[in-house]
């Protein structure tokens, strides 16, 4: 199914793709949950209640670490990518390129069963 939201068209997104997006966001700079969710929401119609368990899983698997930092009088939890997370990101990027190339091949008529 496709969800139309304003000028955006959302396709269903797997948890693995969300993991890939999260690791990509955090690789460029340490980020807090809401900031990550806003970036992921550019392509995926997800709720914070979906995002936070995935962040927890990435942390449990050793791909992310967390630290707290004060912002406007409140503690904010930041996520930082680990070396294992960077390795996972490289792997997921290769998988994404292969997947994207296959879809492009089908759309462009280069791939048929």
Named regions from a protein language model:
Residues 52-57:
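Short, hydrophobic-biased segments on the C-terminal half of alpha helices
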Residues 71-93:
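Basic, amphipathic "hinge/linker" alpha-helix immediately C-terminal to the N-terminal HTH DNA-binding motif
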Residues 38, 83, 98-101:
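Generic recognition of well-ordered alpha-helical segments
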Residues 1-9, 79:
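A positively charged, amphipathic N-terminal helix/segment that binds anionic biomolecules
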Residues 66:
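Short beta-strand "wing" residues that participate in macromolecule-binding interfaces
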Residues 4-7, 90-113:
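Amphipathic alpha-helical dimerization/coiled-coil segments
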Residues 62:
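Glycine-centered, phosphate/nucleic-acid-interacting loop/turn motifs that mediate DNA/RNA or nucleotide
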Residues 10-50:
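N-terminal helix-turn-helix DNA-binding core of bacterial DNA-binding proteins
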